[in-house]
Amino acid sequence: MSDAALIIEEDTPLVEERIERIYGTVYAMSSPNAVHQHIFIKLAHQLDSFFDGKPCTPYAAPFDLYPLANAGDTETVVQPDIFVVCDKERLKIDGYYGPPPLVIEILSQNRSHDLVTKLNLYHQAGVEEYVVIDPLDKIVMVLTYGEGAYRYNAYSFSDKIPSHRFEGLFFDLSFPLPF
């Protein structure tokens, strides 16, 4: 006999609602568009290849990140597009508890959420490198944490974009987009 429960269709949404909770405020997350997904899958593959056989591992949304867990806040939870885990002690079956060294967000509909709200959260948590990809303007912003603030570098999609945290890692966004 199956453990699956019978679900009444009219009572159940087709897709599970995804949310992020930052400092007690809940944010609904919409489904990513085709361009976002195209970039996402290409970058996930690049990071998976780069970290193969190395001590760090990339994780992709939807997977929970509790960036302020070190400070005792396990209520704040986000689902970055991609983040890299190096401290396996913080990795649990249900998420990662603490700031990862690298977070990547691909901008979609709610640009200010990634550019303001999550930037401030990642800064407070001590995320070392925050990469924001803007498919609309074809710009990549690499923010590297040091001396209490983020240092900002901007690149175009045609540039060879270096990670400032992981030597030898480059983000290649020179591939054609579907739209």
What is each stretch, according to the model?
Residues 1-179:
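Gly/Pro/Ser/Thr-rich low-complexity, intrinsically disordered segments predominantly at protein N-termini
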